[in-house]
Amino acid sequence: MKKRIYNLWLILGLFVLLMLAAGCGDILSAQENTQNELPGAKFVRQIVAKDNTSSRVIMWQSDEPIADGAVEYRQVGDNKVSRVGAKGEIYTDDGQNLMLYTAKMENLPAGVELEYRLIGNGQVGKWHSLSTDDGGAFTALIFPDSQSSDYSGWQELAQNAAKRNPEAKFFVNMGDLVDNGEDHSQWEAWFNSLAGIIDRIPVAPIM
């Protein structure tokens, strides 16, 4: 009798474990295919590194801290994922505190297409494109001052240039990026104007 009860509990235990595993698998699968950014993260951007053939800097910010913030990346078509931790620091912008995260990917293969995503708070974000330089000729987008009244002109200029030059490897923004560097709304307008660009190719800002 005791043996039967033991076997029954064993079967029930295995059943529960299998159900939990299946549930976790569904969650991970849903996260893997998400088309949304990591909750709380905004203004994801690539920054030029010392050597763009083998390294890249990824930055983003959030209004609240993100636990265990990191960047996962992989070569396109390869399921092997690497991870690098992100350093978070408090940054005060126009009297408002926010969290600024920085992750540096190194020892990347040259001349390849990769993709990266943000992780944190037990969640993952969507994949973003990233390509490393091959050391040869390249195309870059070079913009003058982007400061303006409402940044609609800057948005039109940047987006049209990116569409006409999809092969561009990075972009340079010379001079004054915003009219008032102490006005956080202007920085948000500057970043919003670069949606779909700055997360895909790195920026080389010149203040």
Where are the model-predicted features located?
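Short, low-complexity intrinsically disordered segments
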Residues: 7, 58, 125, 152, ...
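Acidic, histidine-bearing metal-coordination/catalytic regions of metal-dependent phosphoesterases
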Residues: 9, 13, 20-142, 163-164
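Active-site neighborhood of divalent metal-dependent phosphoester/pyrophosphate hydrolases
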Residues: 135-207
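Positively charged n-region of N-terminal signal peptides that target proteins for export
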Residues: 1-6
